[in-house]
């Protein structure tokens, strides 16, 4: 494994550990999810460019579209929870009912 892949994998693991350890606030969880998506995007792009996968050139763009949708939904949920309860604690998400 080259150093580039090792560093990208380390960034993904650090974001995952941040997501698992700092779950109290919704904003920190969203930032850790964005770090994971960014490291996945870079890993996918580097892998496709190094291995010359011509059929998979659109895969990083599709991943970015899903990351943008995830960020938009997460921020809208953050705004809704902070307007309703005044805080962005993840514990408040258990109180939401349809």
UniProtKB/Swiss-Prot annotation:
InterPro entries: NADH_UbQ_OxRdtase_chain4L/K, NUOK/Mnh_C1-like. The chain crosses the membrane at residues 1-21, 29-49, 61-81. Its main location: mitochondrion. It comes from the Eukaryota. Core subunit of respiratory chain NADH dehydrogenase (Complex I) which is composed of 45 different subunits. Belongs to the complex I subunit 4L family. The lineage of its organism: Eukaryota, Metazoa, Chordata, Craniata, Vertebrata. This is NADH-ubiquinone oxidoreductase chain 4L. Its EC number is 7.1.1.2. It is found in: Mitochondrion inner membrane. The gene is MT-ND4L. Core subunit of the mitochondrial membrane respiratory chain NADH dehydrogenase (Complex I) which catalyzes electron transfer from NADH through the respiratory chain, using ubiquinone as an electron acceptor. Part of the enzyme membrane arm which is embedded in the lipid bilayer and involved in proton translocation. Pfam families: Oxidored_q2 (PF00420). It is a multi-pass membrane protein.
């Amino acid at each position: 494994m080259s150093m580039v892949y090792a560093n990208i994998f380390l960034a993904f693991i650090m974001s995952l550990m941040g997501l698992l350890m700092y779950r109290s606030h919704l904003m920190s969880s969203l930032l850790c999810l964005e770090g994971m998506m960014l490291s996945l995007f870079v890993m996918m792009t580097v892998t496709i460019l190094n291995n010359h996968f011509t059929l998979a050139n659109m895969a990083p763009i599709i991943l970015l579209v899903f990351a943008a949708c995830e960020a938009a939904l997460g921020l809208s949920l953050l705004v809704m929870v902070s307007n309703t309860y005044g805080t962005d604690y993840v514990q408040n998400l258990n109180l939401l009912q349809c």
